[in-house]
Amino acid sequence: MEQYHGTTILSVRRGNSVALGGDGQVTLGNIVVKASARKVRTLYQGQILAGFAGGTADAFTLFERFEAKLDKHQGNLLRSAVELAKDWRTDRMLRRLEAMLAVADREHSLIITGNGDVLEPEQGIVAIGSGGAYAQSAARALIENTELSPRDVIAKSLAIAGDLCIYTNQCHTIEVLD
């Protein structure tokens, strides 16, 4: 799976709570052009969490398409994700978009890729972007060895990723569904 530079997005679930967070750094090549971008948001009346890694304009196009799928399928995350992935695979314009989405509701956490894949990682941890592997490793260790809330796991994991990945900073946005 191709990783896109310029961000870290992480989702963690524990008990009845799920959180999704990301950093705010936007880069153009090797230059930081913005430090406080908001790459994480709530969708479908606050019932769905979503974050993106990749080109900003591409991600906003995908957010719009995904929101339309959520509306069409009454907020059904799995069905909306599969329908978006189908469109992404078959539509010529969408196939050119370079972004990935991490999405979550109260029951599922998914990665939607431009290859038409809809993945539900094990252990309720989703990570995308250039710092995703660092954040995922930190989150897994924190989930297995602490009682921290999903929000706190994400905050600490993104901080670790920001220390290690040059495309990830310490300006975080975290959304939670309790």
Curated annotation (Swiss-Prot):
Location(s), subcellular: Cytoplasm
Gene Ontology biological-process entries: proteolysis involved in protein catabolic process
UniProt xrefs under Pfam families: Proteasome
Keywords noted in UniProt: Allosteric enzyme, Cytoplasm, Hydrolase, Metal-binding, Protease, Sodium, Threonine protease
A GO MF label: threonine-type endopeptidase activity
Gene3D superfamilies, sorted: Glutamine Phosphoribosylpyrophosphate, subunit 1, domain 1 (3.60.20.10)
Active site as annotated: T7
The EC number(s) this enzyme carries: 3.4.25.2
InterPro entries, A to Z: ATP-dep_Prtase_HsIV_su (IPR022281), Ntn_hydrolases_N (IPR029055), Proteasome_sua/b (IPR001353), Proteasome_suB-type (IPR023333)
Entry keyword annotation includes Hydrolase: yes
Catalytic activity: ATP-dependent cleavage of peptide bonds with broad specificity
One GO location term (cellular component): proteasome core complex
Record-listed Na(+) binding positions: G162, C165, T168
Activity control: Allosterically activated by HslU binding.
Family per record: Belongs to the peptidase T1B family. HslV subfamily.
Record function comment: Protease subunit of a proteasome-like degradation complex believed to be a general protein degrading machinery.
Quaternary structure and interacting proteins, as annotated: A double ring-shaped homohexamer of HslV is capped on each side by a ring-shaped HslU homohexamer. The assembly of the HslU/HslV complex is dependent on binding of ATP.
The protein's name: ATP-dependent protease subunit HslV
Organism listed in the record: Azoarcus sp. (strain BH72)
High-level lineage: Bacteria, Pseudomonadati, Pseudomonadota, Betaproteobacteria, Rhodocyclales
